[in-house]
From Swiss-Prot:
It catalyses: 2 H2O2 = O2 + 2 H2O. The modification N-acetylserine is found at residue 2. Keywords: Acetylation, Heme, Hydrogen peroxide, Iron, Metal-binding, Mitogen, NADP, Oxidoreductase, Peroxidase, Peroxisome, Phosphoprotein. This is Catalase. The modification N6-succinyllysine is found at residues 13, 221, 306, 430, 449, 480, 522. The gene is Cat. Residues 1-22 have a biased composition (Basic and acidic residues).
Length: 527
């Protein structure tokens, strides 16, 4: 029976076999003191109380009480691996970034795949966007390309992100996933139509992590050695081929093997079947951006490939599993603001918001010195700055070097060649409403030209199967949005909803307790 077990199932057995010639280590406390008895607490007599001096117990229990760190507010369930990025095509005419320096150059990478809305223990096979984040360890510091498996997103303005995520997570009173919340937000923000359509298509449930594409999604800026800049988008297409899970199979796996994606990735790498992705860019000049028919920084839209073809750049290859999940995957922290010279942000509103949000959440989750954690450390660059101290400072704290700038003592100096590309700005400063920036044209193309008839049928079935659990007035708003995309799109979904609603009558409205009313009433009763 053991011969048929996969590497993930046999991890403990393999660990023992790798150490077969070694004697077991001496068991110690966290402070390195040898332990004589790990099976029995120290008591005053066989039936007496525990003694405070049992430091073996207190050392063990105190550490156990603090094992968990805050869960990621999104992308909590994930799998990670390590490998390299190899340049196969020259793009130095676009970017001076050292990661693209010459053909054949290899850069170490770390990758984390994830679902978005589920908790850490949730299933890998739910219908949910997938995170696909890549950390490049370059000589000019880390480059974190924090992407997804879709080239688009639900919203285009970062201020909506907390509310969007709240709507996808659990109801604040029932603590249940709530279709009313999900579809109410989507129906009120029709810019979500493109991503919603992608999500409920066949690609909404990838077959594990190896068989899906990745996208930087945002628009970025590339700058070459002459200071010339272009806008770009990043794509990484799976070399294993796109594979998706049918709804029934995904449901079965969610029950029988909720860690399906994690297991599949670990076993593939352990068996030498290294997954890879071909890396591409799209490029748009500043002049083209000015005359583009829509906002080129809009995260709810794609750049047409016929106008902006994919330019091959290199390969992402994953060939090493993590040695310890917590140390190397749970503590892995991606930050879109980590950009080496040659790669810069665009005015994309969602990207601009993420530049702040990601490092901020890492400082909360992992501490202010999270970049000293080995998996996050830019180990191929020398970190030299004026940041000091803070909880969990694990290095030499930059020794006796000056901790202020400027100074007269040969401490780190700024490098003019690292200056960002300059941008001229003479515009009004205000809160611009971007809600109605053509939310349907590209969705219509997706529905009528990208999908075939069978795929359209499954898309509408998937949407109706989820939307049916929302209230009727929310269903009506959602169907109107789909009808705006294409009459056939809305009509199919409405017909399916009519069947569902005939089987199960809907309440007209839910009543929610006003905030604080229960506690207020209880307080008055006690007066």
């Amino acid at each position: 029976m053991s011969d048929s077990r996969d590497p993930a199932s046999d991890q403990m057995k393999q660990w023992k076999e790798q150490r077969a010639s070694q004697r077991p280590d001496v068991l110690t406390t966290g402070g390195g003191n040898p332990i004589g008895d790990k099976l029995n607490i120290m008591t005053a007599g066989s039936r007496g109380p525990l003694l405070v001096q049992d430091v073996v117990f207190t050392d063990e229990m105190a550490h156990f009480d603090r094992e968990r760190i805050p869960e990621r507010v999104v992308h909590a369930k994930g799998a990670g691996a390590f490998g390299y990025f190899e340049v196969t095509h020259d793009i130095t005419r676009y970017s001076k970034a050292k990661v693209f320096e010459h053909i054949g150059k290899r850069t170490p990478i770390a990758v984390r795949f994830s679902t978005v809305t589920g908790e850490s223990g949730s299933a890998d096979t739910v219908r949910d966007p997938r995170g696909f984040a890549v950390k490049f360890y370059t000589e000019d510091g880390n480059w974190d390309l924090v992407g997804n498996n879709t080239p688009i997103f639900f919203i285009r303005d970062a201020i909506l992100f907390p509310s969007f995520i709240h709507s996808q997570k659990r109801n604040p009173q029932t603590h249940l996933k709530d279709p009313d919340m999900v579809w109410d937000f989507w129906s009120l923000r029709p810019e979500s139509l493109h991503q919603v359509s992608f999500l409920f298509s066949d690609r909404g449930i990838p077959d594990g992590h190896r068989h899906m594409n990745g996208y930087g999604s945002h628009t970025f800026k590339l700058v070459n050695a002459d200071g010339e800049a272009v806008y770009c988008k990043f794509h990484y297409k799976t070399d294993q081929g796109i594979k998706n899970l049918p709804v029934g199979e995904a449901g079965r796996l969610a029950q029988e093997d909720p860690d399906y994606g994690l297991r599949d990735l670990f076993n593939a790498i352990a068996n030498g079947n290294y997954p890879s992705w071909t890396f591409y860019i799209q490029v748009m000049t500043f002049k083209e951006a000015e005359t583009f028919p829509f906002n080129p920084f809009d995260l709810t839209k794609v750049w047409p490939h016929k106008d902006y073809p994919l330019i091959p750049v290199g390969k992402l290859v994953l060939n090493k599993n993590p040695v310890n999940y917590f140390a190397e995957v749970e503590q892995m922290a991606f930050d879109p603001s980590n950009m080496p010279p040659g790669i810069e942000p665009s005015p994309d509103k969602m990207l601009q918001g993420r530049l702040f949000a990601y490092p901020d959440t890492h400082r909360h989750r992992l501490g202010p010195n999270y970049l000293q954690i080995p998996v996050n450390c830019p180990y191929r660059a020398r970190v030299a700055n004026y940041q000091r101290d803070g909880p969990m400072c694990m290095h030499d704290n930059q020794g006796g070097a000056p901790n202020y700038y400027p100074n007269s003592f040969s401490a780190p100096e700024q490098q003019r060649s690292a200056l960002e590309h300059s941008v001229q700005c003479a515009v009004d400063v205000k809160r611009f409403n971007s809600a109605n920036e053509d939310n349907v044209t590209q969705v219509r193309t997706f529905y009528t030209k990208v999908l075939n008839e069978e795929e359209r049928k499954r898309l509408c079935e998937n949407i109706a199967g989820h939307l049916k659990d929302a209230q009727l007035f929310i269903q009506k708003k959602a169907v109107k949005n789909f009808t705006d995309v294409h009459p056939d799109y809305g009509a199919r979904i409405q017909a399916l909803l009519d069947k569902y609603n005939a089987e199960k009558p809907k309440n007209a409205i839910h009543t929610y307790t006003q905030a604080g009313s229960h506690m207020a009433a209880k307080g008055k009763a006690n007066l």
